């Protein structure tokens, strides 16, 4: 049992994992997507209300068209093959990011998944796709200014984010052996505890998740206070 309300994961290391195993980048990304399916039972067992996965950043658009096209295709395949199982297990799906950059057919697929699962309450699985936190904050401020407000409060920004109901991040996990948060949930993770692992995401397993949570449980959170 854990008191974590929001677990965020940067799914890093797919391409390096592929290089290590003499595989293509596409095979590495597929292994990363398969890992979500593998870890779903653990996510459900932990009963953490909100889990956000960083799957495709706003910066990822700058990669080769072949890699970008495959990553977009992976999201479509994942929603197509996993949606019924997610729905059956009571998972509410949310997707955040600049989704207008995606094709109309994929946007429709995303909206259908959100609509189908909107009343589920076991856990919320939020997929951050075409997402950048700076962009999210800019979009929120633009929305507020467009509404006619001349002064902006914390509350105004919170309510203008892609998902106003998203709780603050308690624990942010990044596999892959690098130590940065890469423009991910900067607003929501203001007081998050950070956990970094040298293991690549496709090698990550439920015991690694548990190890991160155990490490988190030993920390004394101060939320910027003493």
Swiss-Prot record:
GO MF? ditrans,polycis-polyprenyl diphosphate synthase [(2E,6E)-farnesyl diphosphate specific] activity; magnesium ion binding
Q: Which GO terms describe its biological process?
A: polyprenol biosynthetic process
Tell me the cofactors it needs. Mg(2+)
- Which keywords does UniProt give here? Magnesium, Metal-binding, Transferase
UniProt xrefs under SUPFAM superfamilies: Undecaprenyl diphosphate synthase
EC number(s) from the headed UniProt entry? 2.5.1.-
Which residues does the Swiss-Prot or TrEMBL record annotate as the active site?
12, 60 (proton acceptor)
Q: Give the note describing cofactor binding and stoichiometry.
A: Binds 2 magnesium ions per subunit.
Question: What top-tier enzyme class does this entry carry?
Answer: transferase
Q: Where does substrate bind?
A: 13-17, 25, 29, 57-59, 61, 63, 174, 180-182
Q: Which amino acid positions bind Mg(2+), per UniProt?
A: 12, 193
Query: Would I find Magnesium among this entry's keywords?
Result: yes
Signal sequence segment: none
Q: Does the keyword Metal-binding apply?
A: yes
**Gene3D superfamilies xref list:** Decaprenyl diphosphate synthase-like
Question: What Pfam families does this protein's entry cite?
Answer: Prenyltransf (PF01255)
Q: InterPro entries from the entry?
A: UPP_synth-like, UPP_synth-like_CS, UPP_synth-like_sf
NCBIfam families recorded: uppS
How does this polypeptide assemble, per the annotation?
Homodimer.
Q: Which family, according to UniProt?
A: Belongs to the UPP synthase family.
The role this protein plays is:
Catalyzes the condensation of isopentenyl diphosphate (IPP) with allylic pyrophosphates generating different type of terpenoids.
Put simply, this protein is called Isoprenyl transferase
Organism name: Rickettsia sibirica (strain ATCC VR-151 / 246)
Q: What is the gene called?
A: uppS
